[in-house]
UniProtKB/Swiss-Prot annotation:
The lineage of its organism: Viruses, Monodnaviria, Shotokuvirae, Cressdnaviricota, Repensiviricetes. It is found in: Host cytoplasm, Host perinuclear region. This is Protein V2. InterPro entries: Gemini_V2, WCCH. Pfam families: Gemini_V2 (PF01524), WCCH (PF03716). It comes from Tomato yellow leaf curl virus (strain Israel). Interacts with host SGS3. Through its interaction with host SGS3, acts as a suppressor of RNA-mediated gene silencing, also known as post-transcriptional gene silencing (PTGS), a mechanism of plant viral defense that limits the accumulation of viral RNAs.
Length: 116
């Protein structure tokens, strides 16, 4: 179990509450399989708590709440049928292809320029 006395404390009471909320949500997250809707929703809720400003937190919460209200409780522990593949989302791992070379610009032949 995580011991708050052995770790660095946030500077404010609000930060401390957020830290405890995140630790609690992480323990709840462990009860869901990684490819389930419930796991995805808990990750969204953690991102709400971690948001730096009010506007961003409100935007994330509204998105989370809409997804939660549109999901039946029976589906929370069921595997997600279509996994998210958004490129900007850090929690979704993109499949990597190791045999494809990185983009390397081709060399161009330049005419010999000499001074007159």
């Amino acid at each position: 179990m995580w011991d708050p006395l052995l770790n660095e404390f946030p500077e404010s009471v609000h930060g401390f509450r957020c830290m405890l909320a995140i630790k609690y949500l992480q323990s709840v997250e462990e009860t869901y399989e990684p490819n389930t809707l419930g796991h995805d929703l808990i990750r969204d809720l953690i991102s709400v708590v971690r948001a730096r400003d009010y506007v961003e937190a409100t935007r994330r919460y509204n998105h989370f709440h809409a997804r939660l209200e549109g999901s039946p409780k029976a589906e929370l522990r069921q595997p997600i049928q279509q996994p998210c593949c958004c490129p900007h989302c850090p929690r979704h791992k993109q499949a990597t292809i190791m045999d494809v070379q990185a983009h390397v610009p081709k060399a161009q032949n330049i005419q010999n320029v000499s001074k007159p």
